[in-house]
């Protein structure tokens, strides 16, 4: 099982303002590809239908998203990745990672494939309450 830093997510109440700020200051480019296709983005079925801007500096991804303080509640999960934001690691063995969390007694929210096409996503909190996403693509 390996891990690689994938992205930083910030949640905002004013997505155009936040995106413009970072694009202007850091010259971030917009990501538009199949991998970043939202699942049912216009539907309430996913528990989150806010807008998301996918940006990159060429090496690191940034996912700026409209804040939704009720995503966890709507998904019946205790971790809400769309309230304060999160950072993300990508793995090649999400099931193995979930077994490790179980063995260590670390609670997590199994969101499955809910927001990005083909990404299986799990969210947890570190001891200080910071939200961490682990996902495996191609699922």
Q: PLM features: residue spans?
A:
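Vicinal oxygen chelate
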Residues: 1, 4-13, 52-56, 74-139
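A short, acidic/glycine-rich surface segment
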Residues: 38-42, 70-75, 110
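Core segments of cupin and vicinal oxygen chelate
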Residues: 11-60
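Hydrophobic side chains in well-ordered alpha-helices
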Residues: 18-21, 97-101
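A short acidic-to-branched-hydrophobic micro-motif
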Residues: 62-66
């Amino acid at each position: 099982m390996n891990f690689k830093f994938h992205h930083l997510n910030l949640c905002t109440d004013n997505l155009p303002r936040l995106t413009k700020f970072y694009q202007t200051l850091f010259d971030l480019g917009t990501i538009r590809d199949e991998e970043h296709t939202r699942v049912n983005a216009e539907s309430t079925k996913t528990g989150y239908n806010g807008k998301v801007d996918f940006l990159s500096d060429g090496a690191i991804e940034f996912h700026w998203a409209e804040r939704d303080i009720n995503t966890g509640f709507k998904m019946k999960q205790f971790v809400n990745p769309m309230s304060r934001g999160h950072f993300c690691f990508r793995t090649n063995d999400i099931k193995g990672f979930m077994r490790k969390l179980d063995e260590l007694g670390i609670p997590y929210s199994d969101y499955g494939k809910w927001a990005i096409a083909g990404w299986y996503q799990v969210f947890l909190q570190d001891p200080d309450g910071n939200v961490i996403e682990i996902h495996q693509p191609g699922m």
